[in-house]
Curated annotation (Swiss-Prot):
GO CC annotation terms, alphabetical: mitochondrial inner membrane
Membership in a protein family: Belongs to the TRAFAC class YlqF/YawG GTPase family. MTG1 subfamily.
Compartments in which it is found: Mitochondrion inner membrane
Taxonomic lineage of the native organism: Eukaryota, Metazoa, Ecdysozoa, Arthropoda, Hexapoda
Example of a GO biological process term: mitochondrial translation
Binding site for GTP: 73-76, 147-152, 199
Alphabetic keyword roster: GTP-binding, Membrane, Mitochondrion, Mitochondrion inner membrane, Nucleotide-binding, Transit peptide
Pfam families: MMR_HSR1
Physiological role: Plays a role in the regulation of the mitochondrial ribosome assembly and of translational activity. Displays mitochondrial GTPase activity.
Entry keyword Transit peptide: yes
Its membrane topology: Peripheral membrane protein
Main location: mitochondrion
Protein name: Mitochondrial GTPase 1
Top-level division of the source organism's lineage: Eukaryota
Length: 316
């Protein structure tokens, strides 16, 4: 059966994957302007794609001149036994990536969450603060691509250290934070403020797979890339790993490499149809492939296919 599966995903129109709206360019400029007020930078990224899609521009414009912590969030969605390999590979690629934490912002007792502030404080105290040496409070900037959990991290840290809720707006749609916000107090002693920032992608995504991996974990908005394309890439990844849990989920008889077959079967399994206007003005009833694609994508994002490190092929 595996011989029938694709071994390479076909190249798609790069325009579908290059999403850099105006607020991202403006946000990057605002972040650079606020750097003089910042003592430490925390970069948040999705643990499922630790080697894909990080904005390398941050290193040259934001994080390269300040103490830096890389937080790999949503660690509950990957096998914890792989964390060591992820760290080793990241440090092979970037000698500056010395401080890496894995977090789950939905769990306040998470060991990584507990380590964030002590580590940041240690890095700040051991650094040369230059123009901020006489400042008693600490200011930490939170950066990253869209929808990796930056605002969630701020909220869980604020709730943990101040026991207050409602620090920063959180949403499941990429790009909800659009401006560099005012300082958000998250600790009284020591006095610590965080700066939330908009998720910012590179203006040009490196390649098809990088873009689709970002899309699969919601760093790109689904409708801009196309739900059926994202579902097709998911099918490709699952087949490549021999993960056939989608067969039962989508009402199939056996694994397949055809996304059309998956979505038609899925819409029938879900009993979902859509009325489509025919060329002669009449309406015909067809399987709702879009809804089936959304169902399949949501199943992945909620863990129905198990814990998956999407970048596992980069460790070979």
């Amino acid at each position: 059966m595996s011989n029938a599966f694709r071994t390479v995903f076909p190249t798609v129109n790069r325009e579908l994957l290059n999403w850099f709206p105006g607020h991202m360019g403006k946000g990057m400029k605002q972040m650079q302007q606020k750097l003089k007020q910042v003592d430490c930078v925390i970069e948040v990224h999705d643990a499922r794609i630790p080697l894909s899609g990080r904005n390398s521009e941050f290193r040259y414009t934001i994080s390269g001149v300040k103490p830096h912590i890389l937080v790999l969030n949503k660690k509950d969605k990957i096998d914890r036994r792989l964390q060591g390999r992820v760290v080793d590979r990241l440090q092979q690629e970037d000698s500056e990536a010395r401080h890496i934490l894995f977090t789950n912002c939905k769990d306040q007792s998470c060991n990584g969450i507990r380590k964030v502030m002590p580590l940041a404080q240690d890095l700040i105290l051991s650094s040369n603060r230059f123009n901020r040496a006489d400042q008693k409070e600490y200011c930490i900037m939170i950066i990253g691509v869209p929808n990796v959990g930056k605002s969630s991290l701020i909220n869980v840290l604020r709730n943990r250290h101040l026991n207050k809720k409602g620090a920063s707006q959180v949403g499941a749609v990429a790009g909800i934070t659009r401006s560099v916000l005012n300082k958000i107090k998250i600790s009284e002693d020591p006095l610590v403020y965080l700066l939330d920032t908009p998720g910012i992608l590179k203006p040009n995504i490196a390649d098809t797979e990088t873009g689709l991996r970002l899309a699969l974990v919601s760093c790109l908005q689904d409708h801009l890339v196309g739900e059926e394309l994202i579902a097709d890439y998911l099918l490709y990844l699952l087949n490549k790993r021999g993960n056939f849990k989608y067969v039962e989920l989508m009402g199939l008889k056996e694994p397949t490499d055809s996304i059309a077959e998956v979505l038609i079967a899925g819409s029938k399994h879900l009993d979902k149809t859509v009325r489509v206007r025919h060329y002669d003005g009449s309406f015909v009833i067809r399987p709702d492939a879009m809804l089936a694609a959304r169902h399949m994508i949501k199943a992945f994002r909620t863990g129905a296919f198990g814990k998956i490190l999407i970048d596992d092929d980069k460790f070979v």
